[in-house]
Amino acid sequence: DVCERSLATLREVGTTNKTHLRDYENAINEETGAILKVHTSNYKILGFTESVSASEIATIKGDLPLIEDLGSGVLINLEDYGLEHEPTVMESVASGVDVVTFSGDKLLGGPQAGIIVGKEKYISQIKKNQLLRALRVDKMTIAALETILNYYIDKNKTFEIPTIKMITESFESIENRAEKLFSMLEGMAGVELNIVETASEVGGGSLPNQFIKSKAIEIDPKNISAAKLEEGLRKLEVPIITRIYKDKILLDLRTIDEEEYEIIANELKGILGER
């Protein structure tokens, strides 16, 4: 939609499920102004598929600028933490891409913003565009983004970023934390509690069809419905977000910090009439 509004002529390359390098070669002509490759960061095509990497396209692009939209914009190798490969910004730049675009939030873990990195030649042209004044982010966003990027520079702090911390926490660590929260909730009237294994989805338009093994506190309310309890928790001044599975509430420990345990215990007691 953005490209169409710019009045650029878009020429699709290949088919939905299979694209070959020759498709790019056949599509390039004297009117081609740039090549855009968009990473499927929020969906996945399964089955009979084939795609062309950015590094392969770089070998045939000539003097044309190669643009890659990564979507999520991850800066660490997620394969080290049991997830499937997700191309990093650094990999994209190293592959020969001239301009890389990605989000400041999502997997990066910062404020909502669009980030553009690339060769000075093209970044300079982008800076001269008159739309820059209308689309640039404010000083608060810049300050928040700078803080997050400094956390990536200091490797000891990278895993303090909430998004990264949640995605990379080990199953064993979550299991231990689940036991602690369970002990604080155990014996609560009007509910049956269990620790169950579950699977977390990253969501937010990132890592489609990838599930991370986790532990959850399963709450089976006896005097109110699971839907009513879920609504009550969600509408608190500090909302507690849960999900319902087989008419039971699940509190996924992957998304809960230890300092939030007491809040959860107190609010549950309040809704169930124990406070």
Question: Where are the predicted features?
Answer:
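Short acidic (Asp/Glu) and glycine-rich catalytic loops that position anionic groups and cofactors
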Residues: 121-127, 154-163, 208-213, 247
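Conserved PLP-enzyme active-site core in the AAT-like
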Residues: 1-152, 186, 267
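Conserved PLP-binding catalytic core of the aspartate aminotransferase-like
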Residues: 166, 172-175, 179, 185-232
